[in-house]
Every structure is written in C-alpha cells, then in structure tokens.
C-alpha cells in the first residue's frame, strides 16, 4: 500500500477528525458509562460500511468492535482506542469545553477515539488494497482499571473474545510531555505494572492524655510508612526499577483521641514479574514486624490491577521503520521506561502488540499541561499524524505478513 496515498487520504479527513475529537471532548463519559460515545462511534462505522459491528461488553452498552474485510484470507491486525473520561472539573477556556459538570477528557482518550476513527476512514478507503483483515477496538474503562470497584475494560473485552482470529495489535497514547508530532516507543518493557494495596493497622483506642491505657495504631502506621521504603532501597536489586508510594492515610476523629485503627493505602509500580509477585510478601512482613513490636495487628489487602506494557520486539521494530517512513527518522524516538500504567498490556499478554506515545505538547497552545490535570488539552495538529501512523502501520503489517 502506497504510504503517500495514505497521507493524502488522511489529510482529506483532517478537519473531520479534529471535529470528532472536539465533540468527544464536549461530551465526556467516565468508565463503564460511555453509552452515548459508543452510540456515536457505532453510527459512524455503519455509515462508513464497516461490517460485523458488535456493541457492548460486560453486559453494558459500552464499547464497539468492528471488522474491515472480515471474510478475507490472510493476516489480521487490531487497532485499539480507549474511550473513558475522568471525574475532573475542566478549567480550560476552549469552545469545546466539557459540558458535563465535573467530568472531562483529561488524559486524551477523546483524541484516541478521533484518531482511530480517522484511521478507519483511511483504511476503509483502501480496503480493496489490503491483503488481510483489520479489527477496530473501541475499549471502555481504561481508567476503570485503577479502582477496586471497577474492572479494566481490556481484560473484560478479552474474556468476551475480542482477540479471536487476530495476529497482532497496535495502540497509541497522546502524550503532553512530548513535543507535538514526535513519536516515542520502546521495544520490550515500556510502561510499568500497577498494583494497589491497603494495610489496616488495629490497636486500642483511648484518651490522648492517657496513652498508657491505649495501643496506638498511629505510631505503628507512621513507623510502617517509614520502613516501607527499605523495600526499594534494601530488598530490590538496584539494577531493577520499583516504586512504592503511599497515597492515603485515614485515621482518627478528634485531636485528643487515640484511634482504634489506621488505614494506609498506596501503589506499587514494577516491571519485573518476580518483584511484583514478592511485593505483597515484603509489605506484609514489614507490617507484621512493626505491629508485633508495637502491640498492634495488621491486615493487608493487595490488588494486582494492570500488568506491565511489554512491546513485542519484532513488531516494534517494524513499527519504528514504518513510522520513520511516514513522519521522518528525526521524529521517532526511543522512549525511556515509563512508570505510569496502561491496560493495553492485557492485550499484549495474549498476542504480539506495540504501543507508542504520540506527542501533543505545545507550550504556545497550552497543551503541555500534565495528564489528569484540569487544564490538560491536546494540540489538534497531532491528530493527523496519529491517523497516518495507525493506518500506515496496519497496512504495512498486513502487506509484510502476506
């Protein structure tokens, strides 16, 4: 498939892709509530002639899967975009500001959907030239994987067969720390695993002026928090990477009361599965040791949320070569390891996958604010690059596997 042809077609849909992103941005929906977003995407795909469109996952009306050339012999590739917004009140002053109070697309998923829809338009325009099949995956609840009350959308879609008959998968994330139009990717380990934990420390409540009659769980909790960092500094090989952070401590009801219990909640980030497996063992041991010394009792609740994002080596090399051909060698970078997490990793546990960052940072346009901040925004000039990369890589993959 001619790369220049893809570029020309992408350019023709440039304004439409930008408008789609603005519409998604105005009407954000949080994890497992992406009903209207799903309806809009499904309607567009039917209008553009896609077949075998399936809507909904996990008994909801959220998420869309659609196939291009479903009956064609040959290789197959899936392209994925996440859909959900965040419970954040937007502080941007743009014509397409969120119209949903307290909810905004603060991580760029509006861009991901618009880019994948743009790639869908391009690929449907050249479908007769494609020697294989393309599956589009619009996934709900990527952010949903970060809370114990929710489920990662990727994992749910896999359970319902979204990868059946698919040889490989590709996805992207818009990235404000990276200059608009640049691409960053990394073969092998790319983004960390994400786990959550809560330690509850139980003592015996009492009067703050009579500590001898109480068993102080706050003292145990503060000692526990301090000693936690010895896991990273003294138990994890210095050549490995691990993060252990405390995000929340809940205790007490008044200034003069020693509480009965303290709840400490945090996250771990790892790349090495052996270290990830050992984290709850190490946390529990420190909690038990501290509590034994200070007459308290500890309980650990440990939840493994998202595995590390591991890019397939060969597929990533192929993507890098394709990207260099589309946007130029100087605009493709090898990324450092990234400590945030992404449930695209569930797909990569099943089939070869490549995930990359697309830069959208432009200080002149105010699009260099951090992800998950109320002033996060995307430079629309990045969108057409994303369309070309997804469509171009899908076409190159199918041609190379023929």
Which residues does each predicted region cover?
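Histidine/acidic-residue-rich, glycine-tolerant segments that coordinate divalent metal ions
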Residues: 62, 86-87, 92-104, 110-111, ...
């Amino acid at each position: 498939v001619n790369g220049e042809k893809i570029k020309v077609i992408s350019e023709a849909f440039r304004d439409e892709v930008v408008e789609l992103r603005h519409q998604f941005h105005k009407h954000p929906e949080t994890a497992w509530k992406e009903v209207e977003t799903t309806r809009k995407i499904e309607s567009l795909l039917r209008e553009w002639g896609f077949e075998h469109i399936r809507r909904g996952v996990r008994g909801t009306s959220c998420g869309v899967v659609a196939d291009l050339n479903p009956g064609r012999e040959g290789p197959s590739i899936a392209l994925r975009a996440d859909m959900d917004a965040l419970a954040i009140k937007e502080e941007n002053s743009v014509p397409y500001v969120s119209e949903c109070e307290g909810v905004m697309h603060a991580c760029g998923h509006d861009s991901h959907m618009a880019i994948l829809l743009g790639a869908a338009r391009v690929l449907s325009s050249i479908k007769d030239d494609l020697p294989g099949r393309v599956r589009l995956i619009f996934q709900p609840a990527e952010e949903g994987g970060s809370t114990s009350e929710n489920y990662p959308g990727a994992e749910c879609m896999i359970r319902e067969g979204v990868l059946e008959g698919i040889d490989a998968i590709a996805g992207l994330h818009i990235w404000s720390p990276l200059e608009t139009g640049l691409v960053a990717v990394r073969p092998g380990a790319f983004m960390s695993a994400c786990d959550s934990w809560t330690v509850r420390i139980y003592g015996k409540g009492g009067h703050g002026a009579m500590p001898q009659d109480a068993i102080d769980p706050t003292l145990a909790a503060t000692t526990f928090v301090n000693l936690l960092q010895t896991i990273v500094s003294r138990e994890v090989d210095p050549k490995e990477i691990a993060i252990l952070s405390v995000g929340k401590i809940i205790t007490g009801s008044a200034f003069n009361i020693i509480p009965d219990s303290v709840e400490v909640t945090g996250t771990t980030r790892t790349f090495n599965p052996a270290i990830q497996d050992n984290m709850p063992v190490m946390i529990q041991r420190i909690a038990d040791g501290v509590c034994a010394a200070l007459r308290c009792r500890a309980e650990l609740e440990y939840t493994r949320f998202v595995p590390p994002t591991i890019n397939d080596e060969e597929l990533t090399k192929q993507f890098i070569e394709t990207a260099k051909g589309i946007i130029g060698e100087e605009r493709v970078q090898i990324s450092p390891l990234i400590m945030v997490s992404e449930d695209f990793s569930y797909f990569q546990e099943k089939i070869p996958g490549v995930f990359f960052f697309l830069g959208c940072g432009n200080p002149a346009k105010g699009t260099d604010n951090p992800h998950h901040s109320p002033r996060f925004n995307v430079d629309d000039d990045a969108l057409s690059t994303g369309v070309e990369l997804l469509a171009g890589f899908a076409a190159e993959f199918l041609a190379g596997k023929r």
